[in-house]
C-alpha cells in the first residue's frame, strides 16, 4: 500500500532539506553527554542541543548470571553484545540520548530484577519497562513497587494462560498501570486486534503502545496486518512502535519492501503517536542491519520531514516514558 496517494503527510515526507545527511552524521560522530549521577532527573532539552533521539526498544543482558540467573534455555546474544556498556557505545555512536529498556523475557522471563536495577542505577539515560505474569495475583502489587521504587515507566503486556489479552488478570494489570500513569506496551499479533481494541476502549486514559505494529512483516499477511493497524489508529490512546522494518523485511538494508507500510502507519497514527526503537542488540534481533543503519532508515531512507522525524525519534517517546503523568 502506497501512502503517496493519500496526500498530506506523504507529501511533506519528501522534503529532507531541513534535516540533512551532513547534520545527522555530525551529530552521530560527535556523540552526546549524559548524566550518570544516581537520582538525577531527565531535564528539558535546550533549543541549541542536538535533536532529541530516544531508543524505545532495547533488550539488555546482564553479565553476572549468579546475581541475575537466566531461564533454563535463554536466547543469547553473541558474545559481548547486549550489555549496558555495548548499548551505551551504540547510543553514543548514533547520537541517541535516552533509551527504554524492555524486559528481556527470552532471557529472564518474569524476573525483572536486572531491568529494574539497571534502570534505577542509570536514571540519566534509561527507563525500564517490566513484564509481569497476568496469571499471578501478586503482579499488580509488584508493578506498583517497580514504579514507585525503581525507574520503571511501563509494562509490557501479553495474553494470559487462557490465551486471551482481555483476560481478567491482564485487565487488573492495565487498571493498575492506568492509575499509576505509566505506559502499556502490547505485544500481540493481529489475531488479538479485537481484544486489544476492547481493552483500550475500557481504559481510555491509559496510553498503549503496539509493539512492532502487530509484528508486521513482508508477505501474505502484510496487507491485512496493515489494515488492522490503520483501524486501531482510530483509538486516540493507541500508539505505534515502528520497530518492524528490519525484523519484518525480506530484503537487505535499507529494507525498502516495508517503507510504504511504515509511511502508511505514520499517516494513520500521526507522528505524535509513533515512536522508533532499535531492537537492540541488533546482532541478535535484526542482524541484517546495524544500530546506526536502523536509525538511518528513519533519518535518511523514508523521506520524513524534520517535524515528523522530531516527533517519531524523540518528542513522542519523551512524553510517553520520560515525563510522569501521575
For each feature predicted by the language model, list its residue ranges.
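Active-site metal-binding loops of divalent metal-dependent hydrolases
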Residues: 58, 104, 213, 279-280
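Short, structurally constrained coil/turn elements
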Residues: 47, 122, 148, 202-204, ...
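Mid-to-C-terminal alpha-helical segments outside catalytic/metal-binding sites
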Residues: 3-4, 9, 14-39, 45-56, ...
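Mid-domain alpha/beta scaffold segments of enzyme catalytic cores
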Residues: 39, 46-172, 176-180, 299
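Active-site micro-motifs of SAM-dependent methyltransferase domains
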Residues: 60-62, 215, 247, 282, ...
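Short beta-strand segments
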Residues: 100-103, 131, 241-244, 275-277, ...
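A short, hydrophobic/aromatic-rich structural module that often spans a beta strand
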Residues: 102-121, 208-209, 257-264, 288-297, ...
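Catalytic pocket-lining loop regions of alpha/beta-barrel enzymes
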Residues: 153, 164-275, 284, 325
Amino acid at each position: 500500500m502506497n501512502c503517496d496517494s493519500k496526500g498530506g503527510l506523504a507529501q511533506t515526507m519528501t522534503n529532507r532539506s531541513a534535516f540533512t545527511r551532513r547534520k545527522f552524521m555530525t551529530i552521530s560522530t560527535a556523540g552526546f553527554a549524559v548524566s550518570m549521577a544516581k537520582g538525577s532527573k531527565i531535564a528539558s532539552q535546550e533549543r541549541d542541543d542536538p535533536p532529541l533521539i530516544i531508543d524505545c526498544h532495547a533488550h539488555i543482558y546482564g553479565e553476572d548470571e549468579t546475581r541475575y540467573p537466566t531461564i533454563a534455555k535463554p536466547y543469547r546474544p553473541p558474545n559481548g553484545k547486549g550489555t549496558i556498556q555495548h548499548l551505551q557505545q551504540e547510543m553514543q555512536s548514533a547520537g541517541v540520548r535516552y533509551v527504554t529498556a524492555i524486559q528481556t523475557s527470552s532471557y529472564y522471563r518474569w524476573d525483572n530484577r536486572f531491568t529494574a536495577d539497571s534502570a534505577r542505577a542509570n536514571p540519566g539515560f534509561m527507563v525500564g519497562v517490566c513484564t509481569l505474569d497476568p496469571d499471578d495475583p501478586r503482579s499488580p502489587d509488584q508493578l506498583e513497587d517497580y514504579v514507585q521504587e525503581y525507574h520503571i515507566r511501563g509494562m509490557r503486556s501479553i495474553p494470559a494462560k487462557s490465551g486471551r489479552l482481555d483476560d481478567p488478570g491482564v485487565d487488573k494489570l492495565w487498571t493498575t498501570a492506568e492509575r499509576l500513569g505509566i505506559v502499556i506496551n502490547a505485544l500481540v499479533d493481529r489475531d488479538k486486534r479485537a481484544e486489544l481494541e476492547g481493552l483500550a476502549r475500557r481504559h481510555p486514559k491509559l496510553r498503549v503502545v503496539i509493539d512492532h505494529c502487530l509484528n508486521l512483516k513482508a508477505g501474505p499477511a502484510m496487507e491485512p496486518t496493515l489494515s488492522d493497524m490503520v483501524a486501531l489508529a482510530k483509538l486516540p490512546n493507541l500508539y505505534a512502535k515502528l520497530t518492524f522494518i528490519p525484523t519484518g523485511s525480506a530484503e537487505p538494508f535499507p529494507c525498502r519492501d516495508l517503507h510504504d507500510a511504515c509511511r502508511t502507519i505514520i499517516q494513520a497514527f500521526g507522528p505524535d503517536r509513533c515512536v522508533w526503537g532499535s531492537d537492540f542488540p541488533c546482532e541478535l534481533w535484526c542482524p541484517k542491519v546495524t544500530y546506526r543503519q536502523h536509525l538511518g532508515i528513519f533519518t535518511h531512507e523514508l523521506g520524513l520531514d524534520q517535524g515528523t522525524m522530531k516527533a517519531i525519534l524523540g518528542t513522542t517517546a519523551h512524553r510517553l516514558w520520560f515525563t510522569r503523568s501521575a
